[in-house]
Each structure stands twice: as C-alpha cells, then as structure tokens.
Regions:
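Predominantly soluble domains enriched in secretory-pathway, periplasmic, or organellar proteins
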Residues: 1-328
C-alpha cells in the first residue's frame, strides 16, 4: 500500500525558451525560480500558468539560490562578479548587490541565526555574510572542495560536504570546524536532514547514505544511479526524493531505507525543486538540445487538487527545519 502511494508520475513536460544550461532551481513565493548562467538570467516559472512569467536579466553568471520566505527575499550567487544579488520575490526586482571576496557558488540562508553562507568551489572557502551590514564578515579557508550545506537546528551547527576529502564538516556559531564525519564512500555531494528521525542523508557515488545525525555513523546504504546529487526531503510523506544527472528521480522510503520507486524522465537535469504544500516536483533540463521542465507528483495526489492549491500563491511554501543549499 505504501509503495503504491509513493509512486511518481509525470504530470507535464513543458518547453522552456532558450538552450539548456541550468544551474539551480528552487521555490520562492509559490513560483519555481531557475538560474541560467549561459544567458545571464534568472527565470520565474509559474506552476499554474505553466510558463515563464518573469525574467531578471543583465546579471553576471547566476548560480546558487536561497530564499528567506519570511521577508520575501531571495539571494542569488553571481559568480561572474563575486557578488550576491538581493531579490524581492514580490516583484522580482534586484534591490541591491552585496560584494564578496571569492567567487560564490552555493548559498544558504539560516533564519535561526539570520546568517547567509556562501561557498566558493573555485577558492575552496566558506563566506559568512551579515545581512544587517550587507557585508561579508568572515571567510573560512576549507582547503577542500565544498558542495552542499545545511543547518542542523538541534545541534546549532552548519553541515558542509567536502567532496574531495570524503567528509562532512560541522561548523559552529563561531565559524570554526568542530568535527568531521568521514563517509565510507567517495564524492559526497547533496544532503538532506530529517530532524525528527535524526537522520542525515548524503548523496555519494552510486548510493545515498543514511547517517546518524548526531554521531555520523552509517545506518543504511541505498543504491542509486551515478550522478545522484540533489536530495529533497518530504517528511510528511516519509519520502526522500533524489535526482540523478541522467534525468531519473528516485522516491526513497524513509521507513525502510529502500528505493520505493524510480521514474526515468525525458530530460537530463540534476537540480530539483519540491513544493511540499502541493506535492509537486520540478526538474528543468535538456532534451535533444532543447530546454524542458518536467513536473512530477506522487500518484495519490489528484491533478485537480494540485491546481486548486497551486492557484493560491499567497500561501507561503513551508520551510523545512533543515535549510539546505541544493547541488549545483
């Protein structure tokens, strides 16, 4: 019965303008936001109208995105000029730009501490930005290749995957590395944290690991396609969604730590956005040289209910307790 409820189905396959070349996708103010470095644009896709409804142009190499739902603000890493754009999600306008020392790649806003974090893959650093000052206040030299990051509210620490070292670093409020989990696998990238179960899920080469979030001990190992990077948690549905570069999306049963369902899509993409309020998954990617948006949903959710719910964008998308920066 659980397996039937968890099965994914493709709701729509939609053409997007331009050539493929997406960096990150996320939800903001009920819309799907996509960064496109190739065209130096940020595009806003409406799940209801199923088309691009806004576009932010003339920005330099947009990459990672993070959202402060409470203030209606979105932050976008601009790798081309070492800065972070501050965007108002009510009208999709750039309010200001914050300079940083190192080329930013991924961002994470932590509402509990009112802190913005930015990784630099090029310079192997982690920057801390104080938004009250609109300034970078600290740079942590990692001497490793940073990938995904999330905040563990229970332990009040930032967790950061170090891909080339095969480690997960734990960083405290004073911006010091206070611990490292060594995973028995190569190339850890995406993460998701289940606060209730105290399980940390980590994408590694050909698997997703379930770790004890307090000790780092491996609890389970779930086989996955190569290139699986993006992980998105649905605690209400007891599911973990994982996207691989070949376009397949996995639904992992968190009760049994097994893949409940795998759905190959018609596009090649590696970043996903999940709208927990409406149970919809968005995967932008490419197919035969053209840009596409795949919309997926668990088979138990009807199309009518999804569209009725999605037609009320004023309803804020819930923020999970574990804030996560998606894999580029």
């Amino acid at each position: 019965m659980f397996g039937l409820a968890a099965k994914l189905r493709q709701v729509a396959l939609i053409d997007l303008p331009g050539s493929p070349g997406f960096s990150q996708v996320t939800m903001a103010n009920g819309q799907v936001v996509i960064t496109r470095p190739g065209t130096n644009t940020i595009e806003v896709f409406s799940p209801v109208k199923r088309r691009i409804i806004a576009r932010i142009s003339q920005i330099n190499d947009p990459r990672g995105i993070t959202v402060d739902n409470d203030s209606g603000t979105m932050y976008v890493a601009l790798a081309g000029n070492n800065s972070i754009a501050v965007v108002d999600t009510r009208n999709w306008s750039v309010e200001k730009v914050i300079p940083v020392q190192h080329r930013p790649e991924k961002l994470l806003w932590v509402p509990q501490t009112k802190t913005l974090y930015a990784t630099s893959v090029l310079d192997r650093t982690l920057s801390i930005i104080d938004l009250r000052l609109s300034a970078e206040t600290h740079v942590l030299e990692l001497n490793a290749l940073p990938q995904d990051m999330l905040y563990d509210g229970a332990r009040q620490t930032l967790l950061l995957t170090l891909q080339d070292l095969g480690q997960i670093a734990s960083i405290d409020r004073s911006n010091k590395i206070i611990g490292r989990y060594k995973v028995v696998a190569s190339e850890p990238t995406g993460m998701a944290l289940d606060e209730q179960r105290r399980r940390l899920y980590v994408a590694v080469r050909y698997a997703v690991l379930a770790l004890n979030a307090d000790t780092g001990a491996e609890v389970a190992r779930i086989p996955a396609p190569g290139g699986t990077d993006a992980l998105v948690l649905d605690p209400g549905g007891n599911l973990l969604y994982a996207a691989a570069g070949d376009g397949s999306v996995l639904a992992i049963d968190l009760n049994r730590n097994v893949v409940d369902h795998e759905l190959p899509t018609d596009v090649k993409g590696y970043s996903i956005a999940y709208d927990p309020a409406h149970k919809m998954i968005f995967l932008p990617g490419g197919r035969e040289g053209r840009s596409k948006m795949v919309i997926l949903s668990p088979s138990g959710v009807t199309e009518t209910n999804r569209l009725q719910n999605a037609a009320s964008p004023a309803e804020a998308t819930p923020q999970s307790a574990a804030q996560t920066a998606m894999k580029k």
